[in-house]
């Protein structure tokens, strides 16, 4: 609960957000243009991106591959190292390892430097060393598939509508990134694509779509000072809604400081 909020549907969906947030970080760093989130018929979820691929080299301090550190050690995410991500949306390097620990099993497949690598974990434990399984050509990216642990979660059925709302927000907040949500569960098959070049300016248009705007043009500005980047879009309407996001996760305007 400390990391994902609950062991119900909210926490279950959060597992997907955490893996997807790592892909968003790749986009914010300029290396990922598409994320595919798939709800599989067997209860697993798959998150695939076309980023650089999680590093596979051996870490000098631990003696294990960087990808294994990401999935088995807290605070081992790429955003902590030198040259890490300038902006990040996840749990600051703990997200992937938490998802792994809360899953019956998790498999990661990486395309990097022309080669494909795979590794499997069960309840957080490494099943075999990272292995090279083939070639990728020019393709790069990371694919993660996991099965939430029924011994931990009270609910193991993903809520498509909640995921759709969050992934839509994620796409609005990371302009240019395409996110495709696919439901392959029997009797629930559907797909939705989110891709917004207008970013949060387009998000305001979406939020105001059924409201009466008090003026036609959206107020927009962006800037950076002392290493803090700020982007603002607003358009007053005849009701009251205040939404606040930081990097690019939602926050409660009443409690955020």
Predicted segments, located by residue:
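Conserved small/polar residues in nucleotide/adenosyl-binding loops
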Residues: 245-250
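Conserved ATP-binding N-box helix of the HATPase_c
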Residues: 10-31
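Short beta-strand elements
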Residues: 230-240
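A conserved short beta-strand within the histidine kinase catalytic ATPase domain
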Residues: 33-38
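GHKL-type ATPase core
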Residues: 43-61, 66, 77-206
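Conserved activation segment of eukaryotic-like protein kinases, specifically the C-terminal portion
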Residues: 72-76
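Bergerat-fold GHKL ATPase/HATPase_c domain
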Residues: 1-17, 68-69
């Amino acid at each position: 609960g400390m990391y994902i909020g609950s062991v119900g549907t909210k926490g279950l969906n959060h597992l997907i957000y955490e893996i997807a947030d790592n892909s968003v970080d790749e986009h914010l760093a300029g290396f990922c243009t598409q994320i595919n989130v798939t709800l599989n018929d067997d209860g697993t979820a798959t998150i695939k991106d076309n980023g650089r691929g999680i590093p596979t080299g051996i870490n000098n301090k631990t003696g294990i591959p960087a990808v294994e550190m990401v999935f088995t050690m807290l605070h081992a995410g790429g955003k902590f190292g030198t040259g890490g991500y300038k902006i990040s949306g996840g749990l600051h390097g703990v997200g992937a390892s938490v998802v792994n620990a809360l899953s019956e099993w998790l498999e990661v497949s990486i395309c990097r430097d022309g080669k494909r690598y795979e590794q499997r974990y069960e309840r957080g434990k490494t099943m075999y060393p990272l292995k090279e399984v083939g070639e990728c050509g020019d393709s790069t990216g990371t694919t993660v598939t996991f099965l939430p642990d029924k011994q931990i979660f009270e609910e193991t059925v993903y809520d498509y509508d909640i995921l759709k709302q969050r992934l839509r927000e994620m796409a609005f907040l990371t302009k240019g990134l395409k996110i495709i949500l696919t439901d392959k569960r029997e009797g629930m098959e559907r797909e939705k694509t989110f891709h917004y070049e207008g970013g949060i300016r387009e998000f305001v248009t979406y939020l105001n779509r059924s409201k009466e705007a008090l003026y036609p043009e959206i107020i927009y500005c962006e800037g950076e000072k002392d290493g803090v980047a700020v982007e603002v879009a607003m358009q007053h309407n005849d009701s009251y809604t205040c939404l606040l996001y930081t990097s690019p996760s939602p926050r409660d305007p009443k409690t955020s400081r």
